[in-house]
């Protein structure tokens, strides 16, 4: 650009972790920190004006990977910027590297539902026990606690029959972030007809 490098600074943009997000496109830019005066005929530099701090323009493309979001820019001296606009308002006289940090998403929807089947095969959901959340963390298991093998519902004793989605992890599709827990009535037993035996009565 016909300007000596010693009168310019470089802004560089990188990702802290390419597995979480990338910084691509224009990842560096040059800024001139001196006003330069030249001879009108020879073009030689005749005088330098005072140094003027320069603003980064952040021309790069920042792309989070699935399950992550952009969190902040970090400047060399551990100054942080929460957005491109904040970064662009900063100014420097020396080379700088800006590091894009990404964090896992914690705003994902998931649901856990509990169903109870009586002796007649009628299935009823315990809506009061349902868990509906919009603060799911990407990649974490939906079921984080052990499901009890026995449960009481409407004054009756039930035994755990099956769990649909027991090992599911929270993903990006809310329709897939569902776990259904099924209990079956257990009011009678093989040894004592009046005592539950952890075997569904329908069997």
Q: Which positions does each model-derived feature cover?
A:
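Small-residue (G/S/T/A) turn/hinge positions that recur once per unit in extracellular repeat modules
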Residues: 17-26
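Solvent-exposed, conformationally flexible loop/turn segments
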Residues: 26-41, 48-56, 93-95, 133-144, ...
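Surface-exposed receptor/substrate recognition regions of extracellular proteins
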Residues: 39-42, 68, 108-110, 178
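Short, acidic Ser/Thr/Gly-rich low-complexity loop/linker segments typical of extracellular
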Residues: 24, 124-135
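Proline-threonine-serine-rich low-complexity tracts
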Residues: 108-111, 116-118, 141-147
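Surface-exposed interfaces of beta-sheet-rich extracellular modules
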Residues: 53-85, 140-174, 198, 203
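Conserved "repeat-terminator" motif of extracellular CCP/Sushi domains
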Residues: 1-15, 82-115, 168-203
């Amino acid at each position: 650009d016909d300007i000596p490098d010693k009168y310019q600074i470089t802004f560089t943009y990188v990702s802290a972790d390419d597995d979480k997000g990338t910084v691509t496109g224009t990842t560096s830019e040059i800024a001139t920190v001196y006003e330069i005066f030249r001879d009108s005929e020879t073009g030689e530099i005749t005088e330098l004006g005072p140094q003027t701090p320069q603003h980064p323009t952040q021309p790069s493309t920042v792309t989070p990977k699935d399950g992550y979001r952009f969190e902040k820019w970090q400047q060399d001296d551990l100054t942080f910027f929460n957005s491109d606009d904040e970064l662009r308002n900063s100014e420097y006289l020396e080379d700088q590297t800006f590091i894009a940090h990404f964090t896992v998403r914690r705003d994902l929807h998931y649901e856990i539902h509990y169903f109870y089947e009586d002796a007649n095969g009628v299935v009823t959901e315990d809506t009061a026990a349902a868990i509906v959340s919009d603060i799911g963390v990407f990649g974490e298991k939906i079921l984080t606690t052990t499901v009890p093998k026995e449960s009481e519902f409407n004054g009756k004793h039930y035994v755990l029959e099956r769990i649909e989605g027991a090992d599911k992890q929270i993903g990006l599709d809310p329709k897939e972030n569902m776990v259904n827990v099924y209990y079956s009535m257990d009011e009678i037993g093989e040894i004592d007809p009046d005592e539950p035996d952890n075997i569904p009565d329908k069997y």
